[in-house]
Design a protein with these regions (language model features):
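Conserved Rossmann-fold NAD(P)-dependent oxidoreductase catalytic core, especially the SDR/UDP-sugar
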Residues: 97-139, 382
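NAD(P)-dependent short-chain dehydrogenase/reductase
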Residues: 152-204
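NAD(P)H-binding glycine-rich loop region in Rossmannoid oxidoreductase-like domains
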Residues: 50-91
Length: 477
């Protein structure tokens, strides 16, 4: 039985890979980074580590997969958002380097690196073939292209076979809003949220449905040999944004406005898959005309998974916004409410033989500084100063209050005590968070060791049973 290690977070792409290889009687291992993800039923063993972790070498040594497939350009673990693009790029390259190095050292037969059309970001008028020089401009494109170069370098310098597969605009039916990362589901989401689509009729594109992509990958993986290092898998079904927008407008129940923003010369981004089709018998079975209506139908049935509470068609936006504002304003309202009894107590204690020496405003400031920290201590101090000045105006004029040095001493005392205690509270809170973070890190390392150990035992038992059941084993003799 052949085995494969699929590296990448679970999603429509990874799930299709798992289902396909399971049907073909492969043993499936997965490597993910998110502990919250649930292991699919067909996965033999799941590992949860960072791709650049030292544990990667151990798990590859334990599982000994025939093939390692790195989902790379389509791994949903990498968000590629503006604020995190550089960090994602560093993690991507270091993770891929660790995977390639570990696989090569441990004798993995075949490593598959999944790339995409993002490595070509210039404008083209002809179909793009595998030998054309890449032209990335964005951080994501440059990172994926760098991953291709790294993979091809290992193919040339090690005994391990490495294949680079560019999947052209792969799309699927998204499970939720976060999964709307391809061109088609992204346009469907925009139409659902805003009821408006901006299109460029001169921009040609081609997208590949995830099931067709997985079928092509399986054909390449099971082949005894491959003639080339780089392959394109594409649908070659050329469409424009306005064609997709009109189909969405036709199928979506809500009114959709299409805004034509056609500018510039005609351009197209179509990857030629002639090299792949010459070597492997792939048949593209799914068209965007059939899949986009399915995407729209799924989104309409599960709007709660795709729309935020304050967005159009949700219906409960105002109530949720008010609730969020109230939650944020609660500590401030609490300070105002508690100020009233302290203000009354302070006024009643003036001239009292028993309570005259108690500074109720100082107690009030200390209470909120200890409970909430520096921010609420500042508000409590301001309210205390207002209450103090208001009480002093009973017996003196405003001008006399302004020039009285005792007023400023009292104000300084309140603020110094409040800010000091509030600062200590915030510092203790940060120290507690750092301590918990360190405990979580050490616990995670311990869990990693435990998982690897349990996995090794499971694999050992599997092979022991296989040896005993063999017709040539000593146990059967």
């Amino acid at each position: 039985m052949s085995s494969i290690l699929i590296v990448g977070s679970y999603g429509s792409f990874t799930n299709e890979l798992i289902n396909k290889f399971y049907k073909e009687n492969w043993r499936i291992y997965t490597l993910i980074c998110n502990k919250k993800l649930i292991k699919p039923a067909h996965v033999f063993e799941q590992y949860v580590f960072k791709y650049d972790s030292d544990s990667v070498r151990t798990l590859i040594n334990s599982s000994r997969p025939d093939v390692i497939l790195f989902t790379g350009a389509y791994d949903s673990y990498y968000k590629w958002e503006d604020e995190s693009a550089v960090e994602d790029s560093l993690n991507y390259v270091t993770g891929l380097s660790n995977l390639l190095m570990s696989a090569a050292m441990l004798g993995t037969r075949h490593f598959i690196y999944i790339s995409s059309e993002k490595v070509f970001e210039d404008e083209y008028i002809i179909d793009i073939k595998e030998d054309l020089q890449t032209s990335p401009n964005s951080v994501k494109g440059m990172t994926i292209s760098q991953g291709e170069n790294l993979a091809m370098h290992f193919n040339q310098t090690t005994q391990m076979e490495v294949s680079v597969i560019r999947l052209a605009g792969m799309y699927g039916i998204p499970a939720d809003r976060k999964a709307c990362r391809d061109i088609y589901s992204g346009m469907c989401l925009k139409a659902l949220v805003s009821g408006r689509l901006q299109v460029n009729a001169k921009k040609g594109l081609s997208a590949l449905f995830v099931k067709d992509a997985v079928e092509g990958l399986y054909l390449l993986t099971k082949a005894p040999e491959r003639k080339h290092v780089i392959y394109h898998i594409s649908s070659l079904e050329e469409v424009t944004e306005d064609m997709v927008a009109r189909l969405i407008q036709e199928k979506l129940s809500n009114q959709i406005d299409i805004v034509d923003q056609t500018v510039g010369l005609k351009s197209r981004l179509i990857l030629s898959n002639s090299r792949f089709l010459e070597e492997f018998p792939l048949e593209i079975r799914n068209s965007y005309k059939d899949i986009i209506p399915q995407i729209i139908m799924y989104m309409n049935r599960h709007k709660n998974l795709f729309l935020h509470s304050d967005e159009k068609y949700q219906g409960k936006g105002l109530g949720h916004r008010v609730l969020r504002v109230l939650k944020k304003a609660f500590p401030f309202l609490e300070s105002l409410v508690f100020f009233i009894p302290f203000f009354i107590l302070n006024n009643q204690s003036v001239g009292n033989d028993y309570f005259g020496g108690i500074n109720f405003y100082l107690l009030y400031v200390l209470l909120f500084a200890v409970i909430h920290g520096r921010q609420q201590a500042i508000l409590a101090s301001l309210l205390s100063v207002i209450g103090y000045c208001y009480r002093q105006l009973y017996s003196t004029s405003g001008f006399s209050l302004l020039i009285d040095i005792n007023t400023y001493i009292w104000i300084a005392q309140i603020f110094v005590v409040g800010l000091t205690v509030g600062h200590l509270k915030d510092k203790f809170r940060d120290m507690e968070a750092d301590k918990n973070e360190q405990i979580d890190f050490l616990s995670e390392r311990l869990n990693d060791i435990t998982v690897i150990n349990s996995s090794n035992i499971k694999i050992k038992n599997y092979y022991a049973e296989k040896i005993i059941s063999s017709t040539e084993s000593i146990g059967r003799i």
